[in-house]
Amino acid sequence: MTREEIENQIVLGKKNLKEELKSFFQEHSFRRIFLVAGSSFPKLPIGEELQELFSKLGISFYHFSEFRPNPRLEEVEEGITAFSDFQGDVILAVGGGSALDTAKCIKLFTGLSKDRPYLEQEYRENDIPLVVHPTTAGTGSESTPFAVIYQDGEKCSVEHESIYPKYRIEDARSLRSLPIYQKKATLLDALSHAMEAIWSKYSNEDSRAYGQKAISLILTNYKAYLSLENKNDAKVQGKASSAEDPSQAVLESIAEAANLAGKAIAVTKTTAGHALSYKLGSIYQLPHGLATAMVNRALYPFMCREKCRMIHPENLLFLAKCFSAETEEEGAKRYLEILEDLEIIPTLSVKAGDLENLVAAVNPERLSNHPIALREEDIRLLYKEILGGK
């Protein structure tokens, strides 16, 4: 996507969240809202406020929560049936990447034939409005035309400009109550997006600008973000201004970083840091952001060593400067220091055959955005390092 297309998104909640949402639903005359959100939705600050608003405006809503992390195709199909039965006039997604990706696919597939597998059909635009609100700071799905679902245990990438959300609700309060482990894992996903959009073969001025700003916000705020007390009490009910609650500025900065990193990969798509992470995460049950960080932990120094093979090697120096480093190698070192500081990289229980299973599972097409053409021996070397030399 181009920067112009990305920035056409309409953002709600920049000033007065409640009033902006009220005006939005009234102006569009939405009467039947199909809500895609996890079971914790009613307990979220924005969940309570939306339910109160729906009641005041006489809006009916159906809460679809029948999906798991890393949503399955069959769960999306259940959502399509529920949306059709409810006859909703808008889809509202509230949650992390799984909720948003599920909603995106419900929107996209609803316009397709039920007589053929959805993933095999040609996608097309439809006029179902899609409103999203991310409650984590990592995937950036609120600002990308991508979704990820799984079929028979295999990752399926869905891409179409129709699922780039036209409307985004901005409200960072939910980040405060995330478990510390989830804060770290999602933060690493955002950082991976920003890094990969900078070194991508298709990196351009826009993706680098988005990525640079995202990394700056993360490095400036991540320690304060992780030190915030994990709570969701009356003190944080109602969107406080940064002046009223200085910690709100930290939450908003982290949310902005994840959003900018999402915009960055909307321009370039992801690279080997993601392509090599999916099977790794599946085998060892790792959160997606952590899996990408474990790959990039090996990949970033590898790229510094092999920069003579790289398309646009100057992007590595640009990335290094984002980490306040003067050389490519020093940039990679700074990244590794951040991972060490987070104390989240696990020791994997590697079984015989895992290495070859990982190497065999990589689809070369997913590596097409990477600035170095990775050979099988490169991939094996990287996985061997990721697995701890096993």
Regions found by a protein language model. Name each.
Residues 283-357:
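Gly/Pro-rich interdomain helix-loop hinge
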Residues 180-233, 238, 245-260, 264:
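C-terminal and late-domain segments of enzyme folds
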Residues 19-20, 43-46, 73, 98-103, ...:
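Short glycine/serine/threonine-rich phosphate/pyrophosphate-binding segments
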Residues 111-206, 214, 310-314:
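A glycine/threonine-rich phosphate-anchoring loop and its flanking beta-alpha core
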Residues 50, 80, 99-113, 143-144:
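Short Gly/Thr/Asp-enriched flexible loops that form oxyanion-binding sites at enzyme active sites
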Residues 1-90:
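ATP/NTP phosphate-donor binding region
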Residues 354-390:
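Short, amphipathic C-terminal "tail helix"
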